[in-house]
Amino acid sequence: MAEGPLAGVRVVEAATLAAGPMAGTALGEFGAEVIKVEAPGAGDPMRTWGRRREGVGLAWKSVSRNKRCVTLDLRQPEGQELFHRLLEVSDVLVVGNRPSALERWTIDYETVHARHPHLVMCHISGYGRGGPKSDRPGYGTLAEAMSGFAHVVGQPDGPPTLPPFMLADGVASLAATYAVVMALYHRDVHGGTGQLIDVNLVEPLARLIETSTLAFDQLGEIPGRVGNRLDASAPRNAYRTADDRWLAISSASPAIAKRVYRAIDRPELAEDPDYVDPVRRQERAREVDELVQKWVAERTLDDAMAAFEAADVTAAPVYDAAQLLGDEHLRARGTFVTVDDPELGPMTVQAPVAVLTETPGRIQHLGRTLGADNDAVFGELLGLSADHLRDLREKGVV
């Protein structure tokens, strides 16, 4: 198998939980060597976060795929110096702590850049550098609230709604990943130096829902919660079927709306400008929704989907986890793969998302035990002797 496009890039990941580690995951899937640095003893809280089996966090296993795991106490001077030795032979540093913590550990950007000018440093934090909140602790939940996401999600008469998964962290990790690749391109292709990448958890998610701030800036309007509707598409909703399943429809273009009308046995609406024109159709969104729901409610999911697929309507079933894993299209694409893990045995995890024809991503292994690669990284890579490593262990440095 061909090497990944990031082969030869070494990443030191000294971040915990979600955003930073997810960026490290993406880089590691496509060939980068990722060395995850954790505190001795407890390690990354992600190891026991969320659902567990035999005490092992399931999310940890997937998020920490392909990573070499080492332990290092960055509060101790010897740990800090060993960390800098690791940075000397690396290309990227991913951190996720507050600026004050990085400064205490001598891994703030000013110190890192002075000692390792070649290094790309990606700092993902709750609020980002600069501003009065820069040194406050922050999790994705706070970003989902501050970004405006929670304000626009939910039913009109209901409370702001937070997602039951790591949305802000995930979006921030994507922004961080492509920023790292751009910074490496600048360094290696244009002959530049390393640089700081400053990503917070609020701004990437706010960018996704920028239509809200645009509406306020230009129209003086503050969009609120509208349930499953979208002000640029009708019909657009989730509809319950006769067998108590659900399907979703999006009709962003007039052509799709016409297909929906014909599929639900209302072909006359496909010729009526009031139901085809995007603006006038949106004004009748509730009426159109009711027509679609009435038709869907009289049919099973299979029958409704068959009719919509025959009419080339953009519709899809609402899946739970089991149905997602069983989808024949995703199975044909190899979306999920089974990986043997020494601790938990066979695990089905999602494959790398982007499919590159010449340099595909791959999963070499799932998350390893705490400090599993201490000897290989500190001994073989950095050249520490067995006696030196033993001394560091006794001091609690590694």
Tell me what each language-model feature is.
Residues 41, 127-128, 201-206, 243, ...:
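Glycine-rich beta-alpha junction loops
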Residues 230, 235-311, 315:
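Aromatic-enriched alpha-helical interface/lid elements that frame and gate functional surfaces
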Residues 1-10, 223-224, 240-242, 323-398:
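Terminal low-complexity tails and localization/encapsulation signals of metabolic enzymes
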Residues 161-171, 194, 226-230, 234-236, ...:
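A short glycine-threonine-serine/GTX helix/turn-capping micro-motif
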Residues 194-202, 307, 389-393:
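Beta-strand segments within the central parallel beta-sheet cores of soluble alpha/beta enzyme folds
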Residues 309-330:
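Conserved PLP cofactor-binding pocket of PLP-dependent enzymes
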Residues 173-194, 207-219, 261-267:
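Oxidoreductase and adenylate-handling cofactor-binding alpha/beta cores
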Residues 1-192, 225, 369, 373-398:
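N-terminal helix-loop segment corresponding to the beta1-alpha1 unit
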